[in-house]
């Protein structure tokens, strides 16, 4: 059962001083060790003795000469050791840590599929094997994600990787009810959010908790249309917690451990892009995690670093003090800059560039998208309770997401970004009339909150990420900025309200109670600035009108 007490320094805001050594958190335990370059060197997919079907899928995705990323090398090497294959279920406890866009999803999916295939009992079991199999689902592995969007993307990718291996994969976020749908009996891999797994395990919230959740989210995206208790944890061999720094963070911590408590005994893999002090402390002091052997840490040499080709552009506030107007102006300048570069490089026939704008609240998403609308910049506003957030599918969001596929299996074209009959206009002109949106088929600007900053792999056409307000700390900055410049591609992150030294703009200084800024110091800096320079690569400061001030 989950412990009753929250461990000390469980979250970042409890007043406990965070000590960093070589960019890694050292409180309250000695600093963890990053792998060296030799340990994490690129290797071919044939080097590890992986299942033949998995190697075939990897080569189909990344080419016959494709090689592993550092975290993939570390993970594949560890999980294919002979003693790992023969180890009893429940003995494997591994923490995978790597920078954004570095192949973390592959680093846990491939070893998971490799072991599931090696121990595959054969075709899906029948009711003669499980007395209640006609009514319940018995997964062999569970993958937990923080959002339905990430669950759907991971499900799609998992099905691609298992195309030549014939393992069964089921994603709960791809069903209208957010449950197991018609699936019964056995399934090799079950993917879902913590909330979905709680419901399917038959765990319920109190009426007070449910009312609070409804109030926070505005509405329930997933109605209780499917009976609870449809999943049994008795056959689970592996559990993966994707985005572990989120699911073991303050908001999801108790729910995540309550899901883990439904599994009798299973190997556990944690995957994360950041390693904050509270996560280290949780794994080394919490009774739920310390009752077994300590976690093995497989950490990429690039952990806590931004993508190497990512340019950070700090925008000085304009004299008008209209930050949202500055954002709209920078959107136009950025799209024009991308179009000019595409023409110069002969890429005019490629998919036009796109921008993702991160805000700190649903209200700010509404404000920014409204200003963009008045400037005739069409955008997709995406929030937890937004009208375009659909059950069972990503809908308009697919325009901005990566669409992987095997050769000869082209993915379907994304749905049109606007469906005039259903989509509510997000702005009106000065006369109170609504522009005709029926002619718009693709939007190039996405405005959202941190809902989409964790784990999602955006399409290569997403060239830029805008941060309208400073994130609460450097780790949040890494998550949001890392949505661009992924997989070795060039990109930029455009930051408003704070410069590279952590100094806030005048408007932000006057708003000392603003969310997401971190503690304001006497010199006008936030805690973010203390370590921001450690993660930045190429950077520049630009005036509100687009003139470069310095690099």
UniProtKB/Swiss-Prot annotation:
UniProt keyword terms in alphabetical order:
ATP-binding, Helicase, Hydrolase, Mitochondrion, Nucleotide-binding, RNA-binding, Transit peptide
Q: What class of enzyme is it?
A: hydrolase
Family matches, as Gene3D superfamilies: P-loop containing nucleotide triphosphate hydrolases
Answer whether the UniProt record assigns the keyword NADP to this protein.
no
What organism does the UniProt record list as the source?
Cryptococcus neoformans var. neoformans serotype D (strain B-3501A)
Q: Where is this motif: DEAD box?
A: 242-245
Protein EC? 3.6.4.13
Query: According to its UniProt record, where is this protein located?
Result: Mitochondrion
Among PROSITE patterns, the record links this protein to: HELICASE_ATP_BIND_1, HELICASE_CTER, Q_MOTIF
The UniProt entry, under Pfam families, shows: DEAD, Helicase_C
UniProt keyword annotation of ATP-binding present: yes
Q: Which residues bind ATP?
A: 98-105
Stated name of the protein: ATP-dependent RNA helicase MRH4, mitochondrial
Q: Which residues form the Helicase ATP-binding domain?
A: 85-293
Q: InterPro entries, per this entry?
A: DEAD/DEAH_box_helicase_dom (IPR011545), Helicase_ATP-bd (IPR014001), Helicase_C-like (IPR001650), P-loop_NTPase (IPR027417)
What biological function has been recorded for the protein in this entry?
ATP-binding RNA helicase involved in mitochondrial RNA metabolism. Required for maintenance of mitochondrial DNA.
């Amino acid at each position: 059962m989950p412990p009753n007490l929250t461990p000390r320094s469980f979250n970042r805001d409890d007043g406990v001083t965070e000590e960093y050594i070589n960019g890694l958190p050292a409180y309250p335990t000695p600093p963890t060790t990053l792998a060296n370059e030799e340990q994490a060197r690129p290797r071919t997919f044939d080097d590890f003795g992986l299942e033949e079907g998995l190697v075939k899928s990897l080569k189909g995705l990344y080419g016959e000469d494709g090689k592993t990323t550092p975290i993939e090398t570390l993970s594949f090497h560890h999980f294919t050791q002979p003693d790992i294959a023969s180890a009893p279920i429940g003995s494997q406890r591994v923490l995978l840590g790597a920078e954004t866009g570095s192949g973390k999803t592959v680093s846990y999916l491939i070893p998971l599929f490799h072991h599931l295939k090696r121990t595959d009992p054969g075709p899906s079991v029948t009711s003669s094997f499980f007395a209640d199999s006609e009514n319940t689902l018995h997964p062999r592995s569970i993958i937990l994600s923080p959002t339905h969007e990430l669950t759907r993307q991971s499900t799609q990718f998992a099905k691609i990787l298992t195309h030549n291996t014939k393992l069964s994969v089921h994603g709960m976020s791809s069903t209208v009810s957010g449950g197991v749908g018609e699936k019964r009996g056995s399934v090799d891999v079950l993917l879902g959010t913590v909330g979905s797994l709680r419901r399917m395990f038959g765990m319920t919230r109190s009426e007070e908790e449910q009312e609070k959740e409804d109030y926070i989210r505005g509405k329930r995206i997933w109605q209780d249309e499917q009976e609870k208790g449809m999943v049994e944890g008795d056959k689970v061999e592996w559990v993966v917690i994707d985005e572990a720094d989120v699911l073991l963070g303050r908001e999801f911590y108790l729910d995540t451990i309550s899901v883990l408590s439904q599994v009798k005994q299973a190997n556990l893999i944690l995957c994360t892009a950041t390693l904050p002090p509270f996560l280290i402390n949780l794994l080394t002091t919490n009774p739920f995690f310390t009752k077994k052997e300590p976690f093995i840490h497989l950490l990429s040499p690039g952990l806590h670093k931004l993508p190497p080709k990512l340019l950070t552009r700090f925008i000085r506030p304009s004299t008008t003090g209209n930050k949202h107007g500055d954002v709209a102006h920078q959107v136009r300048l950025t799209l024009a800059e991308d179009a000019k570069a595409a023409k110069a490089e002969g890429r005019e026939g490629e998919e036009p560039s796109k921008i993702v704008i991160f805000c700190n609240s649903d209200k700010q998403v509404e404000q920014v998208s409204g200003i963009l609308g008045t400037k005739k910049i069409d955008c997709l506003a995406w929030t937890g309770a937004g009208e375009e957030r659909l059950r069972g599918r990503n809908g308009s969001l697919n325009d901005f997401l990566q669409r992987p596929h095997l050769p000869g299996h082209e993915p379907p074209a994304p749905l049109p970004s606007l469906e005039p009959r259903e989509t509510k206009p997000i702005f009106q002109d000065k006369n109170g009339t609504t522009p005709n949106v029926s002619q718009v088929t693709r939007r190039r600007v996405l405005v959202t909150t941190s809902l989409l900053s964790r784990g999602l792999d955006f399409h290569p056409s997403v060239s830029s990420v805008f941060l309208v307000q400073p994130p609460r700390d450097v780790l949040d900055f890494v998550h949001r900025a890392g949505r661009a410049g992924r997989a070795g591609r060039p990109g930029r992150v455009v930051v408003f309200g704070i410069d590279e030294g952590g100094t806030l703009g005048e408007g932000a200084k006057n708003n000392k109670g603003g969310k997401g800024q971190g503690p304001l110091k006497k010199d006008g800096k936030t805690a973010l600035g203390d370590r921001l320079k450690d993660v930045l690569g190429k950077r520049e400061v630009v005036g509100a009108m687009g003139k470069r001030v310095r690099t």
